[in-house]
Amino acid sequence: MALTLRDVQQDVAKQTLKPIYLIQGTDQYLLDQVRSAFVSLIPDEDRTLNLAQFDMRETPLGVAVDDARSVPFFGDRRVVMIDDAYFLTGENPRTKVEHHVEDLIAYAEHPEPQTVLVIFAPYEKLDSRKKVVKLLKEQAAYLAFGDLTEKDVRSMITDKLRQNGFEMSGPAIQLLVRLTNMSLTQIMSELD
């Protein structure tokens, strides 16, 4: 099921979470926003036990899936994040890490109810011909960040300013967008 960033933030705020989230897109600011939202689910004192992050360029997929299958320790839920899920693309990098996507397919069919598995694919496109991609797009909550338009960026700037109790004129926002080459990461760091 396709979602927006606001949908994901509402899921987290209301604690009405799906068992699996697939996050796709190249905008680092938006990826960081999603990551922060999921990290905030686990209290600081429980993060060592109930928050795990795995980089797929260094760790086999099976290790992350096994961790997702384990129940939370002294907490209500566990969050497992899979970073750089290049096996969902057509990319075939030179790496010694071997991934068995069958493990993820089996997990997606029967996820652990107390675990939230978040898969980050920081790519423009996924290989929709792959069985695992088709299954995740059907079973997981799917958030894809497409190319942001100037209108999207301006709207996000206005929202951010409003949240902080500020306003900015249209021409000033347009100038900020132009001077930062529409880089949302740079814009948001300037606004902070």
Task: Name every feature range the model reports, one short phrase each.
Residues 1-192:
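Conserved beta/loop motifs at nucleotide-recognition and modification sites
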